[in-house]
Amino acid sequence: VYAKLAYRDVLTGLGNRAAFVREAQETKQSAAPFGYIMVDVNDLKKVNDTLGHPKGDALIHRVAQCLQRAAAEKGNCYRIGGDEFVVSLNGSREALLACADRIREEVAAADAGSEFPVSAALGLAWSEDQPDPIPAQVFRQADDAMYADKKRMKANREA
């Protein structure tokens, strides 16, 4: 029981950073292509500061549910930080892109009628697109892409 809890995020029920690291180590041993979708929830601090941490927790939980629905049985979802998640998928680049589209749709649907806005920045990376397709490199690429998306979204809001 305790070993299982060590790999679970209490708030969301998703795998935590330790579970993601364990999966990445297993992926490194495999030759199968894989990809990551990094997800960063926008404005969580603003929700926590204005509406309180219980509302922020509800937002995190809602995004986690969006990720689980989007990944369905094709991928694994992890909460790796306060407002950061990663979805890992094996198979094809097309499956990765389709999952990212489903995440965007799920998050947009969660935003409809919400008392606070729900949006997320996404970054994708596929192992076969990398010169060094090890999990750490693919993760860095997805993380960089997520921050670029976050910057683009902020610029669009300010325009």
Label for each model-derived stretch:
Residues R69-K74, R102-E115, R152:
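Short catalytic/binding micro-motifs of nucleotide second-messenger systems
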Residues S88-L89, W126:
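A structural signal for hydrophobic residues in beta-strands of small regulatory alpha/beta folds
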Residues H53, L97-R104, A121, W126-A159:
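Catalytic-core segments of nucleotide cyclases and related cyclic-nucleotide turnover enzymes
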Residues N76-C77, E115-G123:
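Residues at or immediately flanking beta-strands
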Residues K4-Y7, N16-G35, N42-R69, Y78-G82, ...:
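Conserved long alpha-helical elements within nucleotide-processing catalytic cores of c-di-GMP signaling
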Residues Y36, F85, A120-L124:
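A structural signal for short, well-ordered beta-strand segments
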